[in-house]
Amino acid sequence: MLRASILRARPAVRPLARAARPQWHVAQRFYVDDKKNLGETAVPNPAPTTQPSSSPSNPTPVQENTIPASEVPKGPPAPDSTIGASRDAPTTQPSTTPPTGTGTASVAPDPIKPLPKKKRRRFRRFLLWLTILSGLGYAGGVWYSLVSDNFHDFFTEYIPYGEDAVAYFEEREFRRRFPGRAGEPRLHPQISGENKVTIPGRSGLTARPAKENSSDLASRGPHVSAVDDNKKQDKTESGGQQPKVSSQTPVAKEQPVQATETASSKAITPLDHLNVPSATEPVVQDVVKIVNDIITVVNADNAHDGKYNSALDKAKSELTKVVSDINAMKETLEQQAEAKVKAAHAEFDQAAKELIQRLDHQMQAQETQFKEEFENERERLSQSYKERLQSELQAAQKVYEQSLKNRLLEQSIKMQKSFTATVRERVEAEREGRLGKLNELSSSVHELEKLTAEWNSVVDANLKTQHLVVAVEAVKSALETQVVPKPFVTELAALKEIAADDPVVSAAIASINPAAYQRGIPSSALLIDRFRRVAGEVRKAALLPEDAGMASHLASLAMSKVLFKKSGLAVGADVEAVLARTEVLLEEGDLDAAAREMNGLQGWAKVLSKDWLSECRRVLEVKQALDVIATEARLNSLLID
């Protein structure tokens, strides 16, 4: 968005720039306002003064110098003389001043010269990029030489200083991998001035006697010593040239080899395989064998004259050093292996701990899931068992009623049978008495009919009483099991329908406040909870008189915070004692006595507890009515004869 706005604004800026460009040139011509030295005469277009600089890229600043009038040249320099001036060295032009006295120099403004175009530093950029790319290519070649063997051969053979660069990085890699041997020289240290011995490649491989007139280790020659023997040369062969003798090396005189010298030379003792430290290593045994072979060959040479004793002693010491290096390397490798094993053990322990933690988390999650499933299953089973219990209770009720009917039916059948038997006996007796006792028989029949009618009324009364008791218990159960107040119109209507013509039951139901069974009444727990909240408010107003104002309310509220709360069956008529006794009575279940205690309050305490007393009154009315109905049912069951 920003680029688009800049691009759209460029065409509008160009006309303004064209219009302002002449103004810039005019502003450059206002040179008359500058301060000038009237005692000096300036020449227009003076020759540019340049100062040589050591490097073209860092020009030195040029200080302005005022040219005296005596040193001013007669004419301006040619235009071509300023072409070769260095662009990096700035030129200074003195300010133009009007002539003083009888001068011939004309004062005129300098013509405006176009700004010189900046030279493109193509060659310098080319050299810079060439250097950067060459360095990157060289570095990439060194890196790839360390990776690829084929490119390594090509790079070290055809690229200048490629072998040195690759060797440097290989040496760094070797020092990084083997830090213990990084400081040790790989080659035998050479001592300046010592006699150097050149040993052929195949010398000492076989132990055979030396042959005469043959090039071997036993014969003296260039391979024995690097110092050339200064032998005398014949004048005929040298052509008049004298042999050159080195000033540093003395002339060695040839002496014949004698048998006494070979006998006097001490034989070199070979190495013992068992005395060498770490002799059990196969590599050490091979090296000891090679050194012993060399010692055997040297001892077989009778002309060695102890020349190789120092070299072989040094070889023995170097062997000991190599063995110590091998032992150190083994110890280092063992330590590294032990460290790796410990790291692996630590890693395995960490992995095992993480696995145990994951298993613990999984077990906890599974345990939580099982608990949830168990709770859900328990709730489901509880609900199913409740439904099953309800259905079984209903079935048991029906079975009980049916069994009662069956018993009554059996009893009536038995009575009819007994009546029939009695009639038969009577008939037989009458037959025997030839209708002598017809009057007695008719009276007995009337008594039996009366007894049957009475039994039917007893059965009906028992059923009615039982239904009434069940209805009363249903209402009580609904009131006791409710969590929040619920209407019990249905249960009360069923109770009234069962009671039908009973005036006592109808009067008891009529005495209940309609708001009680339409809205419901609170349970004992709700009344206790409501009482505790009301008791807090009553305590705040315990010290208030009947005509209390705002200040009295605030004072009573403040004093209620410091009053001691009584507990138990406290003695006294004060508010705190009444509240304590009421709370104890409520906890004991004596709602009537608790309501009587609260009803004895006076003033604001009674006003605040008025709603709670009305709820207690409705609860007591309902309980009293239910108790009356239950008592009436028991009385009816007792009055049946």
From Swiss-Prot:
Residues 48-61, 89-106 have a biased composition (Low complexity). Residues 17-125 are mitochondrial matrix. It comes from the Eukaryota. Residues 1-16 form a transit peptide. It comes from Pyrenophora tritici-repentis (strain Pt-1C-BFP). The lineage of its organism: Eukaryota, Fungi, Dikarya, Ascomycota, Pezizomycotina. This is MICOS complex subunit MIC60. It is found in: Mitochondrion inner membrane. Component of the mitochondrial contact site and cristae organizing system (MICOS) complex. It is a single-pass membrane protein.
